[in-house]
Amino acid sequence: MAVKKDKPRSIFDDYETSIELEKDGAWVTTSRGYEFKIARIGEMNPEYRSYMIECGKLIHAEIEALEEKVGEKNSECDVKKLDDLAAKMDAVTTEAFARYILKGWRKLYDREGKEIPYSVDNAITLMQMHDLYGELYVLARQYSTFLVSNLETTAKN
């Protein structure tokens, strides 16, 4: 009787990502058990990148102008404006994620027990929960979320 030899582990199983999952989204489960469909953050998502670049340029120009002013006078009002612009950039980042990375969810309920339908507006609202946004952001950056070997799992869902 011949002993069946296991094939060696493939590097492709460990590192090859799916362009389909990166663009259209992969289903992930948060640490609290909620299911979201997220696309990958990066060059494969040109809408996200363009939105971030355009909004970022405008805010960056405002920040540079204020930094020059702050360096001259060190006005508390100008420092507050810089803080406001930093908060504005955070809001832009969160909105970009909600619009272009978060593709859907399943079985999310509001406080009254009503299912929350997927929409960009609802996504923007949900991403205001910074811990949820932070957890999904990390998953959207990880290559392992989008492995080709995950295609079967995503197809079943």
What are these language model-derived features?
Residues 61-78, 103, 107-116:
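Short acidic, glycine/tyrosine-flanked loop/strand segments centered on an H-E-D-like triad
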Residues 35, 93-106:
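Extended, compositionally biased low-complexity polar/Lys-Gly-rich tracts
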Residues 38, 42, 46, 88, ...:
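Charge-dense, low-complexity intrinsically disordered segments
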Residues 76-96:
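Intrinsically disordered, low-complexity acidic Ser/Thr-rich regulatory segments
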Residues 100-157:
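C-terminal charged interaction modules
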Residues 1-70, 147-157:
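Short, charged/polar N-terminal "headpieces" of proteins
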